[in-house]
């Protein structure tokens, strides 16, 4: 049985604002926490609902009068991170960090996980990260998994990618096609977002693997600037893991040939604009300094030499937080933090006001709607779903135009099972009014 909630999309009037205006002042160095009480209250409004509120039919109306119905399809998931639709349009695969690949068919979660997954490490943020289908999946049944891998008895973990054939709830012909040179503490984040580009190549993000973010000194962090390491990079490989001959650093004997771009912290979102063919990424900063970047081959995106964020100690990451020659500035950034996860360009017809928009899932418990102009200028269109008070990990569009999101309650905890799969559906104004009449008084929406 599915349960529904009608929630608004809080859509602000679009405005063109210079980057200098968007930036908010950084706090005074040396503070205990980079977030003020006001910022914390903004991210957790006093009338925010809990994730459990999806069990109750509640209508929240936005100032713009645009609402969505939220349908819970699955619950009890343990840190779900990635979801993908099979070609039939009604079957989904979902990754759980605990090392399980789950199947949802016709809106029902199969209690039995997919069998045959590769061995992986599950310490801290390790485990199964992401899943993506081969562009020719309908014929070859290939899918790809990103996950953390150890090398016991030696210390350290890294990100790996395996290819396998999916057949009715089991994996066969499993082959590890890439083991990244990103061996560091299991406390460090892995990245692991994957997507096939229009060129048929597989793009993979590798995190900065920094397990010391509460301190100001890190041995892993500077490797994001080194072409001899996979840390802090976007990689580009063929579907078998081999290196394309046209990769930007393939002729540099000292560089890793898989590298497409570098100078990243943690890229958790990758999307291609179907209108322009441009590649965009969302980058998760430490405390503030989250970014949206226009991704280009061979470019350096600055981390950690340039960042508007702070270490969790409260000190600035960089003594030059904005621009350095030879490094790309972000097209858009957040201060205070938004914690962007995955993102999509919405192309469906179910939500006309969202069509063509970039939708970015946020671990700060909201989803952002952004509009990218032809000149790559980004305009913020507003946020939605902050009333649910859950962390959004992934967002996807179904073949029939609905929007699906994965949520979790908190970042860590291998036994946590508070994750959900939600479907967003359009709601006509008459239906919202009818449900309001049936349910009585409504909780007001919280403006962003």
Annotate the PLM regions.
Residues 1-9:
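Bacterial N-terminal signal peptides that target proteins for export
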Residues 18-20:
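N-terminal signal peptide c-region/cleavage motif recognized by signal peptidases
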Residues 24-210, 269-272, 278-285, 336-375, ...:
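Acidic, Gly/Ser/Thr-rich repeat motifs that build Ca2+-stabilized beta-propeller blades
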Residues 113-126, 174-190, 230, 239-260, ...:
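Surface-exposed loop and turn segments in beta-propeller and other repeat-based domains
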Residues 159-169, 222-240, 295-296, 419-425:
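Beta-propeller blade signature
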Residues 239, 373-374, 415, 422-442:
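Flexible "stalk/tail and boundary" regions
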Residues 255-291:
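Repeat-solenoid scaffold signature
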Residues 264, 377-399:
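Conserved blade-ending motifs and adjacent loop-strand segments that build the rim/top face
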């Amino acid at each position: 049985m599915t349960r529904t909630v009608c929630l608004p999309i809080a859509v602000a009037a679009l405005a063109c604002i210079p980057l200098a205006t968007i930036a908010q002042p950084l706090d005074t160095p040396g503070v205990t926490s980079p977030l003020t009480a006001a910022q914390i209250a903004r991210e957790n409004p006093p009338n925010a609902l809990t994730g459990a509120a999806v069990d109750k039919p509640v209508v929240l109306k936005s100032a713009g009068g645009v609402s969505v119905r939220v349908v819970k399809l699955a619950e009890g998931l343990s840190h779900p991170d990635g979801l993908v639709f099979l070609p039939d349009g009604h079957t989904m695969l979902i990754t759980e960090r605990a090392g399980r690949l789950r199947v949802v068919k016709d809106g029902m979660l199969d209690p039995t996980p997919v069998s045959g997954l590769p061995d992986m490490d599950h310490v801290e943020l390790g485990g199964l990260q992401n899943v993506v289908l081969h562009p020719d999946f309908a014929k070859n049944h290939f899918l790809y998994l990103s996950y953390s891998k150890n090398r016991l008895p030696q210390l350290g973990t890294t990100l790996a990618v395996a290819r396998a054939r999916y057949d009715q709830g089991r994996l066969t012909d499993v082959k590890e096609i890439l083991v990244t040179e990103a061996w560091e503490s299991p406390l460090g984040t892995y990245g692991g977002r994957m997507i096939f580009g229009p060129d048929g190549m597989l793009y993979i993000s590798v995190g900065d693997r920094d397990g010391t973010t509460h301190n100001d000194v890190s041995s892993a962090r500077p490797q994001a600037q080194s072409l001899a390491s996979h840390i802090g990079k976007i990689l580009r490989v063929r579907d078998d893991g081999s290196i394309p001959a046209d990769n930007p650093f393939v002729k540099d004997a000292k560089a890793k040939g898989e590298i497409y771009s570098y100078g990243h912290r943690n890229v958790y979102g990758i999307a291609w604009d179907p209108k322009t063919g441009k590649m965009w990424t969302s980058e998760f900063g430490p405390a503030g300094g989250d970014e949206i970047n226009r991704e280009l081959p061979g470019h350096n995106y600055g981390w950690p030499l340039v960042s508007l964020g702070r270490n969790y100690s409260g000190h600035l990451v960089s003594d030059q937080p904005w621009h350095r020659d030879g490094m790309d500035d972000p097209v858009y950034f957040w201060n205070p933090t938004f914690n962007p996860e995955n993102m999509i360009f919405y192309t469906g017809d179910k939500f006309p006001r969202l069509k063509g928009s970039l939708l970015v899932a946020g671990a700060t418990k909201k989803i952002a709607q952004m509009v990218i102009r032809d000149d790559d200028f980004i305009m913020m269109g507003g946020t939605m779903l902050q009333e649910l008070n859950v962390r959004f990990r992934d967002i996807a569009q179904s073949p029939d135009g609905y929007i699906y999101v994965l949520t979790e309650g908190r970042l860590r905890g291998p036994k946590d099972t508070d994750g959900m799969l939600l479907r967003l559906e359009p709601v006509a104004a008459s239906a919202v009014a009818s449900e309001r009449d049936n349910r009585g008084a409504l909780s007001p929406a919280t403006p962003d």
